[in-house]
Amino acid sequence: MANPLYHKHIISINDLSRDELELVLRTAASLKKTPQPELLKHKVIASCFFEASTRTRLSFETSIHRLGASVVGFSDSSNTSLGKKGETLADTMSVISTYVDAIVMRHPQEGASRLAAQFSGNVPIVNAGDGANQHPTQTLLDLFTIQETQGRLDNINIAMVGDLKYGRTVHSLTQALAKFNGNHFFFIAPDALAMPAYILQMLEEKEIEYSLHESLEEVVPELDILYMTRVQKERLDPSEYANVKAQFILRSSDLTGARDNLKVLHPLPRIDEITTDVDKTPYAYYFQQAGNGIFARQALLALVLNAELAL
């Protein structure tokens, strides 16, 4: 069967249809069950991280190795020609694309990955995060985790808590879940970090239910998924950060009355928005969620680099 993701740029979660999302998730489930250590043998993938990352970079590079491919790249752009000599991103991507079969890229500037795709020829760009904009592979592992724990991606009650303004993970996840049916979103954030208007407008246009809240306590009994986020210090001025950083903290006592199937997710890193006593509850699933990144990213890379793939 022809693979619709072959050589496709993955810049935004909106680049993927529901059918394509489900294809990635089926492939991820297959790879989790049955590893394929030679699936990308002889392929070379560039890991270009212009912004600090731990989980995403290591997850991608582990995924690449476990599929049998080789990885080249950098985790500190200050030591590259772009950082030291002023080379443009366009020229950097034009050159790197002559060396490799695919490029995984994180950049602090919104839209940088889509710009890179204009100069990479037929070498696919996979966006590993561009500023506060999109983080599509985090969304894929989030969807995989929700499906794994709930058995479905339709009719999910999900609360998103914390920094909904700058948190690219919640933007992408909301857009992805909007492709499925019957989902209800509970947005819990201070006014300074509220979900952007364009996301709310998208939900309204699709007639998808959402509600805004100031308290976590009032919605916990209704939830299937509780998606916590950290306040992103690097994207706020110090006075704003000080005002909001501790406004929403999840403690194990807050989960009294939760449904048995509730899972608490977090894109990590965690700072102090989830206390460690939550780790010991049956609701905590954020470390397993991070581990699922291996399978979601393996699936995406396998599909992007194989014209036909049947696992």
Swiss-Prot record:
This is Aspartate carbamoyltransferase catalytic subunit. The keyword Disulfide bond does not apply. Carbamoyl phosphate binds at residues 55-56, 106, 135, 138, 268-269. PANTHER family: ASPARTATE CARBAMOYLTRANSFERASE (PTHR45753:SF6), ORNITHINE CARBAMOYLTRANSFERASE, MITOCHONDRIAL (PTHR45753). It holds the Pfam family OTCace. GO terms for biological process: 'de novo' pyrimidine nucleobase biosynthetic process; 'de novo' UMP biosynthetic process; amino acid metabolic process. It is an enzyme of class 2 (transferase). Keywords: Pyrimidine biosynthesis, Transferase. InterPro entries: Asp/Orn_carbamoyltranf_P-bd, Asp/Orn_carbamoylTrfase, Asp/Orn_carbamoylTrfase_sf, Asp_carbamoyltransf, Asp_carbamoyltransf_Asp/Orn-bd. L-aspartate binds at residues 85, 168, 230. Heterododecamer (2C3:3R2) of six catalytic PyrB chains organized as two trimers (C3), and six regulatory PyrI chains organized as three dimers (R2). GO terms for molecular function: amino acid binding; aspartate carbamoyltransferase activity. Belongs to the aspartate/ornithine carbamoyltransferase superfamily. ATCase family. Catalyzes the condensation of carbamoyl phosphate and aspartate to form carbamoyl aspartate and inorganic phosphate, the committed step in the de novo pyrimidine nucleotide biosynthesis pathway. It comes from Yersinia pestis. It comes from the Bacteria. It catalyses: carbamoyl phosphate + L-aspartate = N-carbamoyl-L-aspartate + phosphate + H(+). Its EC number is 2.1.3.2. Pathway: Pyrimidine metabolism; UMP biosynthesis via de novo pathway; (S)-dihydroorotate from bicarbonate: step 2/3. NCBIfam families: asp_carb_tr (TIGR00670), PRK00856.1 (NF002032). The gene is pyrB.
